[in-house]
């Protein structure tokens, strides 16, 4: 079964939103295509209740996520340009094989 990877960054979500719809739009589209080719199932940027940046991904396995994330220098550049200065907090969840999944 797949995993959900939730990564939280100490940076305002609004900063990244401006970047991914502006000067880094082509970069995120290229990253999306590479992620799909590497097995990504879902990917969204989100804003938590404190206005901080979150990324929620679904991958076939944690190893597949780590292999992709660790080989994409464009990701590090993107988060740096969004004002991220410290390491993210990542939590992984195993997605249950439940009959009501959408």
Please tell me what each predicted stretch does.
Residues 1-73, 84-102:
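Short S/T/G/P-rich N-terminal loop/turn motif that feeds into the first structured element of a domain
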């Amino acid at each position: 079964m797949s995993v959900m990877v939730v990564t939280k960054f100490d940076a305002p979500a609004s900063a990244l939103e401006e970047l991914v719809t502006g000067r880094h739009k082509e970069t995120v589209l290229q990253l999306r295509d590479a992620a799909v080719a590497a097995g990504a199932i879902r990917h969204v940027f989100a804003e938590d209740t404190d206005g901080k940046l979150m990324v929620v991904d679904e991958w076939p396995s944690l190893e597949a996520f780590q292999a992709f994330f660790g080989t994409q220098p464009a990701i590090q550049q993107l988060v740096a340009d969004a004002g991220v200065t410290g390491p993210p907090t990542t939590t992984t969840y195993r997605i249950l094989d439940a009959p009501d999944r959408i």
